């Protein structure tokens, strides 16, 4: 039975993270700590000999991915479908500013994967745009999981996207998506895609995904979730 390992790595810390400011798809840079976190995560994950590294185009994710690429000898490809959730009117606002402008709205957003800020995306929207990428990787990366290989495909992205994509791959009921909590900066998730015994090894529909690891890190420092 073929097993595909999928690692999803969140970017390192940004100043927006440190200041509890909502980024969404704003293109922010890693902080000094974030760059240290990216290197520490890269040193751990490079030992896994990634088969492929695909990154969001936003700088905080791409710079995190490049750190892994440099240490693993793998080029980094970019896919805009890995961008963070668009947060609409909330982008650039602090948590306190959002709470003052719309009391209770952040709680509703946390508790309902179908809910979106004005002008933004829900977690269901984010999963709908990112899930086809994994489908394509299963179809196109014929070496992924072949002959018992544990070499993972690594997606470097953002906490909101990783949670939404994980929930979708696991087939969780949408009402249960909020059980997947926040991730630390430069932390990662691992899923294993098991092809059914009677399934087609190249067919996405014949894969059952299992969660191996959630929110693992190299533990450079505590950070904002």
From Swiss-Prot:
Substrate binds at residues 10, 60, 158. It is an enzyme of class 3 (hydrolase). It holds the Pfam family His_Phos_1. It comes from the Bacteria. Its EC number is 3.1.3.85. One of its GO terms (molecular function) is phosphatase activity. Gene3D superfamilies: Phosphoglycerate mutase-like. InterPro entries: His_Pase_superF_clade-1, His_PPase_superfam, PG/BPGM_mutase_AS, PGM_Phosphatase. GO terms for cellular component: cytoplasm. The active site is at 11 (tele-phosphohistidine intermediate), 84 (proton donor/acceptor). CDD domains: HP_PGM_like. Keywords: Hydrolase. It catalyses: (2R)-2-O-(alpha-D-glucopyranosyl)-3-phospho-glycerate + H2O = (2R)-2-O-(alpha-D-glucopyranosyl)-glycerate + phosphate. Involved in the biosynthesis of mycobacterial methylglucose lipopolysaccharides (MGLP). Catalyzes the dephosphorylation of glucosyl-3-phosphoglycerate (GPG) to glucosylglycerate. Homodimer. Belongs to the phosphoglycerate mutase family. This is Glucosyl-3-phosphoglycerate phosphatase. It comes from Mycolicibacterium vanbaalenii (strain DSM 7251 / JCM 13017 / BCRC 16820 / KCTC 9966 / NRRL B-24157 / PYR-1) (Mycobacterium vanbaalenii). The lineage of its organism: Bacteria, Bacillati, Actinomycetota, Actinomycetes, Mycobacteriales.
